[in-house]
Amino acid sequence: ASYVYKRQNMESTDTLTVLTHFRTMQQTSEWSCGVTAALMVLDWYDALGDWNEESLAALRHSLDSTELEGYPGTTLNQAIDIFNGVGGFDIISSNDYPDGIWLDDIQGWLSEGKPVMICWNDWGGHWQTIIGYDTMGTENENDDVFLVADSYDTTDHNQDGYGIYPAERLMYNFTMYGAFPESEGGSDMLFLVASPSAK
């Protein structure tokens, strides 16, 4: 079966778990996919306030005097800085899962209404946010798909900020191939799940 997803207004079904009405944004700089992914997550939780790409980027620790000096993008630990800087969020990340995660982990967070930010080798290094998962109604995982909010949505003739990826295929490419040192959270299966702290 092939699906045409209705994007923002999609609702969960027997096979599809989706964050309905997740709003997307397009990054305004080549380097800002990480902070734009964070912006979308903040918006999802109605916590955006006056934050923007520049103000969120300023919350990241400096990479000066490290092997990544001059790198404008966002490492895992810098993405964590963003949510710690905004405040009021609990964070689960690949730092908590040294053996990695798999499809059922992602489905679990989505079913709790939590978007999953990921950093992988798309475009040679890119942050996106998984907002949906479709089993396609089969027992096999090899036809499952992720729906992502993509701040660099330039390749499908519809720059609406949504994309679809074969889930298993993405998981086997879920790496930055050593681009980030362990001191910055490493390079493999980089993900971040932020959710509002219980009050």
What are these regions (language model features)?
Residues 63-66, 123, 160:
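Peptidoglycan cell-wall recognition and remodeling modules
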